[in-house]
Amino acid sequence: MAAGTSTLLSLSGPADHMAEGKGAPLRPSVEKRWKLMEPKQTQAGMFKKMSLVDSDTAAGKGSQDEAYTELSLPTAPNKPRLDRPRACKAYTEQRHNTFTELSCLQERPGDIQAQTRKLENPEGQLGPQQLPSSFLRASGDGTVCSAWPGAPRSEQKSAFSKPAKRPAEKPKRSPMLLAGGSAEGSWELSGLITTVDIPYWAHLSTFKFMGDFWKLHTLSQNILLCNAFQGAPTPWLEHTQVQAPTSSAPSSTASRALLPPTLSSLGLSTQNWCAKCNLAFRLTADLVFHMRSHHKREHVGPDPHSKKRREEVLTCPVCHEYFRERHHLSRHMASHS
């Protein structure tokens, strides 16, 4: 029995022993056992407190659910509803205002187009003073922009943009081309290329025409010079008649025979030509070969008349110089021309 009572005392707390009023101090073994058993008791108390808190929160949730159910209950139409948050009402009003603003913005471009159609002049173009002030928009950096009705809304033309380029004016006709030119003018190349495509075409054509004119002029001068060579026998004959008026008839006929023939268009030299067959040669050696092969030297007879006649034939009618060969005389006559 004594052992059973000791175990019961050890299981009971110190408060029970103090309540009995015995006032006897506890033994150290019993006190150690009580200290070991104390955490279990405190944990049990904490579990009780947690259960009480959970029950309180459940009760609070129930009250909130009841409040929400009361708010969701339908009410009579004449009877005002319960206090609802005013934020929802303000949000719906704001959405309604934004929708109305968007509808106004969608209707506004049509009105602007109607105004522009009314302001158009009979030719279908807007004058610079007829543009309404609503078309002028000021941007943030101070530049003024104009919204044209024909262009889309995204494109805006600046009021300070560069003016359109004027079509190029036709250049004045040259006085050289006014005399014999067509109605279209020399600067229009069969309707394909105009002066706008090729600048300075009129000046170029005038320069080319003048160049061709001077070429023709020099060519005509060259032709006249060649004609002077071709028609040279008559002036040379007159010159011989003036210089030697006292010469006899055989000398005049001989000088006429020694004059150079008509030159070809190749411009061969007048010194290398044959007086007998009227052939011209480029080189003097060719003329010598021709004279030796075709025109052999004639043996002069003892007749003095024939010798005198030969001397008269081979004498220069200008300076009266005598030559042994006929081609020498012809070369000398070329120096007098």
From Swiss-Prot:
GO cellular component terms, semicolon-separated: nucleus
Record has Transmembrane helix as a keyword: no
Gene Ontology terms describing biological process: negative regulation of DNA-templated transcription; oligodendrocyte development; positive regulation of myelination; positive regulation of oligodendrocyte differentiation
Subcellular location: Nucleus
Keyword annotations of the record: DNA-binding, Metal-binding, Neurogenesis, Nucleus, Repeat, Repressor, Transcription, Transcription regulation, Zinc, Zinc-finger
Induction: Up-regulated by OLIG1.
Keyword Cell cycle in record: no
Zinc finger (C2H2-type): 272-299, 314-336
UniProt signal peptide: none
Family: Belongs to the krueppel C2H2-type zinc-finger protein family.
Protein name as annotated: Zinc finger protein 488
